[in-house]
Every structure is written in structure tokens, then in C-alpha cells.
Amino acid sequence: MITIVVIPTERFPWTDTNLLNSIDYRLNNIPKSNQRFAVYAPAWLRLQLEEAAVSLTPSQLLAAIQDIHVPVTSTFALLPKAKRFAQWLLDDPSSNIWHIPVTVLNVTATSKHPTSDIFNYVVGHVSPNAELATTASRVSGTQVVYTRTSKVLGAPLRLAAPTSYYSGYLSSQQLSHVYPSSWTPETFKKKEICFTILPSLTSPKTFLLDVDAPRDPSFPLSVMWPLLRNDAVKSHRLMPPNALLRRTVDPALKPEWSADVDPSFRALRLSRPRGANTSSCHNRHHVPVCDIQCALTPEPLNDSEKPPATHITIHAVPSDLLTVLDITVGKEYPLRLESGMYVPWMLMSLLMSDDVTLTGTRRSVKLETAHAAQRPFTQVKILRCVSARVTSVRAGPATYLNAVCLTLPKGSFKSTMIDTLPSLFPEWPVVSTTAIVDSDHLGDSLDPTFEQRFATMLETLPPGTVDQAIRVALATCPTADETALQLIVTSFNELYASCMTEAQRNRVPILTQQGRTLVFAHSDYEMLAANVPIQVIRGAIPIDHTVNIIARPNRVGGTALQLLLDYCYRMQASPIATMPAGALYRQLFGPWLRAKADCEQLTPVSLIAEVPARVMRAAGWTIQDDMPLIINVMRCYRNVDDQIDDVLTRTETSRAIITISADGIILVEYAPPLPLITLPSSILLPATYTATWLEPPRILLTGSNVSVTSGLSWAEVGSPLDVPPPGV
């Protein structure tokens, strides 16, 4: 077994116990990876290492654990206090493996002030004041190490006696970190390669994975990285990631060769790599992401001055986005269009991310994409991509198949995102525009529009009210009277309730039942007030949306009205915490970026429902022949090389409640709701889709409304789609 030490990189998801995600996403995609890889990073080990890193220097900690090897087979057994220890052995004589005389036990158990002399019979136990290095040194030679201190290092800690004998000794919080006396370690099965967070390089065939990325600052052992890497270089125990990938993923990779890594190459037997493994089915549940470190350069004041760059890190950007857009690391690009706004590829990187921070810090920043700053950034250079990892996109944030609502303030590039991102897939029907509902669509459908009514309402207010309200909303005058702004917010809420809430309620079926729908809104109140049964996600983006509103003066009512509208919508919103809108964008478009980057050839596979012809005829419809009519509930796609026989023979547990109106609109409701996580992992789901008849529909004349319940199954329809190579 080859052991590879991994010090997690920045933003490593500790909730995911699979360390493969922090190395390279391809390790997760090879067949039977769980049979080839083992991960040794138990919770007790991380907790002990974190506590030891506080009291020991990096060099002391490395020295303390140098003789501990993976897997750890020893355990620490925590003894009770002297009086309770004696009482335990009296109550359970079979536990007296030290043959302590009964007279000694009785004296200790009945004494008001017992001494610790009874522990002299426990030969080799760890004393209460023992150093952590001392506790670690006991691990390698003994199966069970008895200890009188809970501060140990190198093996899991369990109770030596039942929990009742520790009353008054350990608090409930301390007990939560100690295993019960009946606990036994899980059997560790050795595999071809074992990944671990135990930073010990003394065992044979143990190497340090040399990932070029910042360490996770929340992991205390990150401070050990320079020292640990220096030791690995001296002992020739560095493991380059490309060497690991060549051995396990693709023998065609050309790793760099140097004397420092000769032992790792020999250990992996790179001269005789295995044949490349290809999975029998693509997994659409996971999307690889990385953190992009960029340098933003402002306009120079003169020709001789070279202004300093601002370094930022864009977190959790889909790795395939840069591949599809043909963006090169290390190359400098213009940041803005002639209009002054950011170039589309940079906007998409920001909108699909989780956060933007100043590189080297945890300070989040919001970028001003409009050309509004005193010295705006004009050039961008991607320095490197770090912290590659895999995120699951089927489990959330959208949970069910039918519809989801994303709330974003004005100026959040909702229309830009929906127009620009699907254009990357000209050959693929990724988005059905009829299944996207814009945040302003409802207000614009009124006559006069909602924004026009709001402008009329502002005109009825006393002179100066709007100006004073804007100063307060923009916080340019902290001491200003907020009465004017409160008046506008109250009037806005009354206006909204009088005309928008009922209109929103009337279009509930269109929002929630026409297929897989993406609904945009300004606030979650818009859905909650109208009782719309839809999952609502309060989104946030790493962009200053207020500056974008100011940079768009041609909207209804001008900048002033738009700023007040934005403020009123934000005051309507609930106090629920926001989440990155990029998480939803990655869920919808991330698997398609992966397919585009790999130049996959796709073929349609549809989720279908059947409507009996006799039911349609009973409602006055004229139908050709007696075969059931097929509804394409959702047209998905799969790779032509995937084997999906199990998909075509499965029936979903949910049933479709189908309503067909006289004007041909098809509404589908799932009972129970259909979770995305239960759908086949090899299927590419469209970002949005509207249910349609499967051609040919065979409907000659329409009739009255029809409602029917149908099962859901999968069928292959249509012809394969060839995918153009990636690039702008």
C-alpha cells in the first residue's frame, strides 16, 4: 500500500470526508475508485492534531508523531479517578486485569481522600501530567494504552470503564469526544493507495502530495506545510499530482521528471502504468470547481506610471468555464467593453462563483462592474487556478424537478446571465426561454405597468420627499430624517398589495407546473404573499448592484426611481440568510460546461408520461387512432457511449398529474414531488424546459380541459447531437 499525506488546500469542504475532491476531480470518476483508494482521516485524528498544533510547535509535532503509522491499531483507555476506579473493579472483578488486591480496592473506595497509589498497579499507564509527545510514543508498541489524562495524541481515546464511573470527572462536552468503553476501531482495509492527513513520512512508501495551492487556513496543520515539504524534499518523498494521475487515470500524461521524485515514480511503477480507465457512464452529479486568482489593473494616470494591481480570488468557479471560453492562464485580457461594463466571460465567472476575496485574506469584496469608480480596473490577468475540488450539484440548492425561484436585487445581471450563458451551447437546447420568468415580467404585463404606477405615486408626494429618501437610501447623509423614506416604503407596499399580489396568484400554474421553470424575483415576499408553492432561494452575487443601477439611467423613471424601487423590494424581503446565486447557476449549467469541455456527443432521452386517447375523446378532443398520446415532460440528454439500459427500464416513484387546457397548454405536477437527487446520474438535465407533446401529437381538433394522472418513465427519442469544440 502506498500512503500519500495530504494537507488540505484552501476552502477544502471538511463536511466531505473524501479527500480525493481536494486533489483532482478525475480521481472520483475512475471506475471502482473505492476499491483502489482508501482515505484515512478519522474525526478523532483531526481533533487531536488540531489540539496538538495549539500547544506544540510544527517541529515538535512532527517529531512526536514520526513513529505513528497508518492505520493506527492502538487505543487509549481513559481510567476513572482513583475512588471510582476502585469501585469499578469491585463491581466488576473480571475487569481487574492488574490483580489489584481487594483490600487495596476497599480502602481506596471507602476513603474520603483516596491517594493515587492504586494506579501503581497499572504498569506503564500515562500519568495525568504527561506531555503529548510522551503519549504519542506509547502508541507504537502497545495495543491498549491506559491513561489518566484525556489530552493524548496518536490513537483514539475510549473510556476504560462504563460512563457512570466518570461522573464528576468529565463534562458532557468532554465525553462527546471520547468513545464508550465498548467501542472498537473499525477494521481498516488496505487498498492500492491510501490518502491520509497524518503528517508522518517515516513509514515505507509514504509520500507528501505536492499540490501547488494555498493551504486551508482553518486547518491548524497548514502551518506545518513548509516544514513538512522541506522534509519531503530532503528525503525524496514528494509526490507530484501528475504522477498520481498518470498511474491511476491516464497513462498518456507526461509528468515532469526530476531526481527529487524518483522514489515516488518507482513506487507507482510508472514504467508499467495500467491502461486508461473509462467509466461506463458519465456522472452528472458532480461538477469540478476551482478558485481563480486574478490581478486587476486600473487605468494609469500617465504613460510612465505602472499602477499596482489588486489581487483577488474568485471562489468555486466551474473549472470547465475557462476551457469552454478558451481563456488562458497567465494572459492579460481587457476587462471592460466599450460601454464600460465587464466583459461577458468575467461576468459569468463572477456570477457562477460563491464569493470574491482579496487574495491571501478572508475579506470578501464586491466588485464595481460599471465604469463608475475614480480609477476603474481595465485589465485582468488570471494568475493561476488553485484548490481544485468537486461539488455535488444534484442535491441542491434546487431540490425538486419542477420549479425554483431565485431572488436577486435589481442590477444583478439576471437577463445578462440567461442570455449569455446559453449562447455557449448553440447546438444544445439547454434552455427553454418560455420556462424562464423574468423578475419584471409581471409588473410589465400590467396596464399601466407597475413601475409607471410607482412613478405616478411618487409624483403625489410632497416636494423634496424623493430627494431626501434617496440620500437616506444611499447612506450619503447619515443624520438625515428617515420619515420620507418610510413614507415611500409604506406607499410602495400598499401599491404592491393592491395590484401585484393578486396578479401573481393568478399565474401560479404557469410558474410552478409548465415544466422545469426558473423564476426570478426581486424578493421572496413576492412569492410568499401570493402563496406560490415554489422553492425560493435568496441569492447574492459578489457585485455591487447599486452601482449598476446608477449606470443605467434609461430605465423607467430614471436612476432615482430605480434606486427607490430596489430599496423598497429589499425592505420587503424576509431576514433569511442569502446564499451565493452561483450555486444555483452551477447546478443548472455546470454539467453542460463539463460536457462541452469534453466535446461529448449527445443523444436525447426523455422523461415521458402517457395520456389515454379515450380520456381525450371524452373531453371532446378528436384524436387520430387509439394509441396513448405521449407528453415529453422533460427532454434530457446522455452521452452516446453511456449504457443506460437500467434507465430505460425504470419507472419513477412520483406520478404526473397532467392538466391539458383547451388552448393546448400542458401543466404537469408531480405527486409526490420529484427530487433531483433521485434522477439517473448519467442524464443531463436541461436548465429549463416546458412540457410538450411528443411529435407527432396526433390531435386533429381540441376540446375542453382534461386532467389525468400518469406514471413517469424514460424513452429514447430524436437523433444524436454533435458538439462543436470548446472556444469562444
From Swiss-Prot:
InterPro entries registered for this protein in UniProt: Reovirus_Mu2 (IPR012494)
Task performed by this protein: Minor inner capsid component. Displays NTPase and RNA 5'-triphosphatase (RTPase) activities. May function as a cofactor of polymerase. Associates with microtubules and plays a role in the formation, structural organization and morphology of viral inclusions, where the assembly of cores and the replication of viral RNA occur.
Location(s) in or outside the cell: Virion; Host cytoplasm, Host cytoskeleton
Keywords, comma-separated and alphabetical: Capsid protein, Host cytoplasm, Host cytoskeleton, Outer capsid protein, Virion
Keyword Transcription regulation: no
Keyword DNA-binding belongs to the record: no
Species assigned in the record: Aquareovirus G (isolate American grass carp/USA/PB01-155/-)
Entry protein name: Microtubule-associated protein VP5
Single GO MF descriptor: structural molecule activity
Record family assignment: Belongs to the reoviridae microtubule-associated protein family.
Cellular-component GO terms for this entry: host cell cytoplasm; host cytoskeleton; viral outer capsid
